[in-house]
C-alpha cells in the first residue's frame, strides 16, 4: 500500500503558482463571501487565506450576517463581477436556508466562478472543453496524475452523486477515457460493484462506510469524505486502517483531497486571471 500525499502535491502546485505570480504585473484577486458564522466554514476560509498569502494573491474576504437577504447577497456578487481587481469569486457553502444556493451560484460570472459550479462551466466540462474545473474533482485528477496512472479503459466507481463532487468527478474520469459507474449510499449490492473497480472515489459523508472486503486488491482508493466524530477526530468515508492493507494506493483523511481542493482553487483563480488579460 502506498499513500497519496495530497498535502505534498498541493504544496508543489502552489509553489509553481507562486513562481508564475511573481512574474505578473498585477496580483490575481480572489473574493470570498462568508454568510453567517459557521465554525467549519471559518476554518476553510482561514485555510484559503493562508494559501492566498503563500502564493501572493490579493484576497478580499466579505463577511455578512446570516440574515442577509437574497437581494443583498446577489447585489454583492454583481459588484464583484464588475470589480477589475477580482478575478475569482467564491461563496462559501453551506448558506442559510432562506437563500437560494442555485441562484447565488448562477449569479457569479462564469468567467470568475473559481469553484467551477456555474452551469456554464459544468456544461463545458461535460463537453470535454473545460475552463474552470470544479475544485475537488480536479484535485483528485491531479492526485491520480501524480502517481502516473493511465486512466484509459480503467474501471472507476464514484460513490456519491452530488453536484459538487460526484457528478463532475464522473465527467472528469469520462473525459480521461475511463469507464465510469456512479453509485450512492443506497445503491444495491454496492460492494459487488466496488470489488470490480480499479479506482474508487468516495464522497457520501458516511464515516468509514467503505470496508476492506469491498475493495479489489491493488485498487486505487480516493477518500473525499470529511466527517467529524463525537470525539473530535476527523475521518473519511473509507475505513482507512482496514482498506490500506488491500489497496495499492490510498488517499487519507486528513491530508489527502482537502489540500488539493484549495490548491486547485488557486489554480482556477490564476486561470481566470490569465483569461482576462
Swiss-Prot record:
Biochemical pathway: One-carbon metabolism; tetrahydrofolate interconversion
Keyword NADP found: yes
Q: Where does NADP(+) bind?
A: 160-162, 185, 226
Keywords, sorted A to Z? Amino-acid biosynthesis, Histidine biosynthesis, Hydrolase, Methionine biosynthesis, Multifunctional enzyme, NADP, One-carbon metabolism, Oxidoreductase, Purine biosynthesis
Example of a GO biological process term:
methionine biosynthetic process
Domain of life of the organism in this record?
Answer: Bacteria
Q: Name one GO molecular function term.
A: methylenetetrahydrofolate dehydrogenase (NADP+) activity
- What Enzyme Commission number(s) apply to this enzyme? 1.5.1.5, 3.5.4.9
Which Pfam families does its entry note? THF_DHG_CYH, THF_DHG_CYH_C
Tell whether rRNA-binding is among the UniProt keywords.
Answer: no
InterPro entries (alphabetical): Aminoacid_DH-like_N_sf, NAD(P)-bd_dom_sf, THF_DH/CycHdrlase, THF_DH/CycHdrlase_cat_dom, THF_DH/CycHdrlase_CS, THF_DH/CycHdrlase_NAD-bd_dom
Looking up HAMAP family in the UniProt record yields:
THF_DHG_CYH
Entry-linked NCBIfam families? PRK10792.1
| Description of how the protein assembles with itself and partners | Homodimer.
Family listed: Belongs to the tetrahydrofolate dehydrogenase/cyclohydrolase family.
As for what it does, the entry says: Catalyzes the oxidation of 5,10-methylenetetrahydrofolate to 5,10-methenyltetrahydrofolate and then the hydrolysis of 5,10-methenyltetrahydrofolate to 10-formyltetrahydrofolate.
Q: Name it.
A: Bifunctional protein FolD
Gene name, please? folD
Amino acid at each position: 500500500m502506498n499513500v497519496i500525499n495530497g498535502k505534498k502535491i498541493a504544496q508543489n502546485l502552489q509553489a509553481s503558482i507562486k513562481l508564475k505570480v511573481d512574474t505578473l504585473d498585477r496580483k490575481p484577486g480572489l473574493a470570498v463571501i462568508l454568510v453567517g458564522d459557521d465554525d467549519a466554514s471559518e476554518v476553510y476560509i482561514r485555510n484559503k487565506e493562508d494559501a492566498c498569502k503563500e502564493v501572493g494573491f490579493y484576497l478580499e474576504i466579505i463577511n455578512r450576517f446570516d440574515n442577509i437577504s437574497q437581494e443583498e447577497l446577489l447585489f454583492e456578487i454583481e459588484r464583484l463581477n464588475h470589480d477589475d481587481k477580482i478575478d475569482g469569486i467564491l461563496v462559501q457553502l453551506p448558506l442559510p436556508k432562506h437563500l437560494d444556493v442555485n441562484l447565488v451560484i448562477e449569479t457569479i460570472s462564469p468567467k470568475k466562478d473559481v469553484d467551477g459550479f456555474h452551469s456554464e462551466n459544468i456544461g463545458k466540462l461535460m463537453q470535454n472543453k473545460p475552463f474552470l474545473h470544479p475544485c475537488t474533482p480536479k484535485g483528485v485528477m491531479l492526485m491520480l496524475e501524480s502517481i502516473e496512472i493511465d486512466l484509459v479503459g480503467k474501471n472507476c466507481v464514484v460513490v456519491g452523486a452530488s453536484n459538487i463532487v460526484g457528478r463532475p468527478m464522473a465527467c472528469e474520469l469520462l473525459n480521461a477515457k475511463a469507464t465510469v459507474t456512479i453509485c450512492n449510499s443506497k445503491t444495491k449490492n454496492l460492494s459487488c460493484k466496488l470489488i470490480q473497480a480499479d479506482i474508487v472515489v468516495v464522497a457520501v459523508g458516511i464515516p468509514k462506510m467503505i470496508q476492506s472486503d469491498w475493495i479489489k486488491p491493488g485498487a486505487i482508493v480516493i477518500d473525499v469524505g470529511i466527517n467529524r466524530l463525537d470525539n473530535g477526530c476527523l475521518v473519511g468515508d473509507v475505513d482507512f486502517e482496514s482498506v490500506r492493507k488491500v489497496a495499492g494506493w490510498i488517499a487519507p483523511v486528513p491530508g489527502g483531497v482537502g489540500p488539493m481542493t484549495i490548491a486547485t482553487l488557486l489554480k482556477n483563480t490564476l486561470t481566470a486571471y490569465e483569461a482576462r488579460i
